[in-house]
Regions:
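Juxtamembrane intracellular "pre-TM" segments in multi-pass secondary transporters
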Residues: 5-12, 194-226
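Helix-breaking motifs and short loop linkers at transmembrane-helix boundaries and internal kinks
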Residues: 49, 81, 102-108, 119, ...
Length: 422
């Protein structure tokens, strides 16, 4: 079947191609972050930055820019459709990546990174809205989890990609090659993706209407607790991401093996997404994610005890962080699915404002966690525990004090639209 508003000459996507395409759009953003990790020290030194923690800003500025930029694409996509917003984001991403490759000072790089992140935030927002256009309930959670599984190939490989480019061509070519990949993805989307927004769900661009839609998405009790909880959990991971090169490569002494350790941890996260995609329709998004949150808190408490004991080894740290990343994967797609479920008619605006709220919270707190790096794993471990406990309180708020409820019994989830995905 064709989607609403689809072009007859464009053949429908199969489910596998649809999932890989959505993952590829999100992966461009991840590539702009994770491929930079091995090059942070070199970039900072070559562009004249002297404070060792300032190198983290190459990552932190991008995360924050993506968070701020997430507020607008949903409203535009609810009016004009998903495709125009995607192509605008892809164009900005490509041009700014090329500009970053040509900078001559650290401040200019940070400014361009911020602008690139602001303008390309639709690459993160639109896949969630497109999936919501097509599916609901646990089926939507499975699709998001499967997309996240494919997407996780990039964080696994990106640091090694970045290190290889750094060694053979220099850090500027990392930006250049991300631009080339963006052009390739743009061509694919142009040729294969039909518009998924139902014309009946188009929203007018009126500030009052946009504000009402966004207010609706943020005032729903069943949703907002999950949005904020997700932001708190991911703040810990962003804190790790910001300081990972210093923490793993320098403090724990991984050195040139840092990309391998990072790939191993990210690979565990990918496997967790695979597990989630297989079990979520059987057990339900709430049961899976609530169990993961409780395990996250328990493991964070163990991390705190090991960090303050002062004898934590690289292997112990890597194993515990890999486990935490697995648990985050079991929460991520499920929290997103639960928080988007009430908003079928305003999926774009809801996805945008939720992504904005979640990302601003996680990027600001993650930046603060990264900047608090003191040569030990203590700040990170403490932040993971505090974030997990606060997230539990917020989930309990959204669930009226009851965990593990199953609202969509197995077999009752169904697609709500068919955008040519089958």
């Amino acid at each position: 079947m064709s989607s609403p508003g689809s072009t007859p000459s464009r053949p429908p996507l199969g489910e596998r191609e649809f999932i890989v395409m959505m993952a590829s759009l999100m992966a461009l953003q991840a590539l702009s972050i994770d491929s930079m990790l091995p090059a942070l020290g070199t970039i900072a030194a070559e562009l004249g930055s002297t404070d060792p923690n300032h190198r983290q800003l190459v990552i932190g500025v991008y995360l924050f820019g993506s968070a701020i930029g997430a507020l607008l694409p949903g409203a535009l996509a609810d009016r004009f459709g998903r495709r125009p917003v995607l192509f605008g984001a892809l164009a900005i991403y490509t041009v700014l990546a090329l500009a970053c490759a040509l900078v001559q000072d650290f401040t200019t790089l940070l400014v361009l990174r911020g602008i690139q992140a602001l303008g390309s935030a639709g690459l993160t927002v639109m896949p969630s809205a497109i999936v919501r256009d097509c599916h609901e309930g646990d089926r939507m959670a499975r699709m998001l989890s499967t997309t996240a599984l494919v997407f996780m190939i990039v964080p696994v490989l990106a640091p090694s990609f970045g290190q290889a480019v750094l060694q053979f061509a220099g850090w500027r070519w990392i930006f250049g090659l991300t631009a080339v990949l963006a052009v390739a993805v743009s061509s694919w989307v142009w040729l294969r993706l039909s518009e998924t927004l139902d014309p009946a769900n188009r929203q007018e661009i009126r500030p009052r209407r946009i504000a009402i839609n966004m207010g609706t998405a943020l005032s729903n009790r069943a949703s907002i607790g999950y949005v904020l909880a997700s932001g708190l959990v991911w703040a810990g991971l962003f804190g790790f991401l910001n300081s990972s090169q210093q923490l793993v490569a320098e403090h724990f002494g991984a050195g040139q093996a840092f990309p391998l350790y990072f790939a191993g941890m990210a690979g565990c996260m990918a496997m967790a997404n695979l597990v989630n995609s297989r079990i979520v329709e059987r057990f339900g998004a709430r049961r899976v994610s609530h169990s993961a949150l409780l395990a996250f808190i328990a493991l964070a408490a163990l991390q705190v005890s090991r960090a303050y004991a002062g004898d934590e080894t690289l292997g112990q740290f890597a194993l515990m962080m890999a486990a935490q990343m697995c648990l985050c994967a079991l929460m991520g797609a499920n929290f997103t699915s639960i928080s988007l479920q009430p908003f079928g008619r305003i999926a774009g605006a809801a996805a945008s404002v939720q992504m904005f709220t979640r990302s601003v919270l996680s990027s600001l707190l993650g930046g603060a966690i990264g900047q608090s790096f003191d040569g030990t794993a203590r700040p990170l471990a403490t932040a993971l525990l505090a974030g997990g406990l606060l997230a539990l309180v917020l989930v309990l708020y959204s669930e009226n004090g009851r965990l593990f409820r199953r609202l969509t019994p197995p077999g009752q989830a169904r697609p709500v639209a068919d955008p040519g995905v089958h």
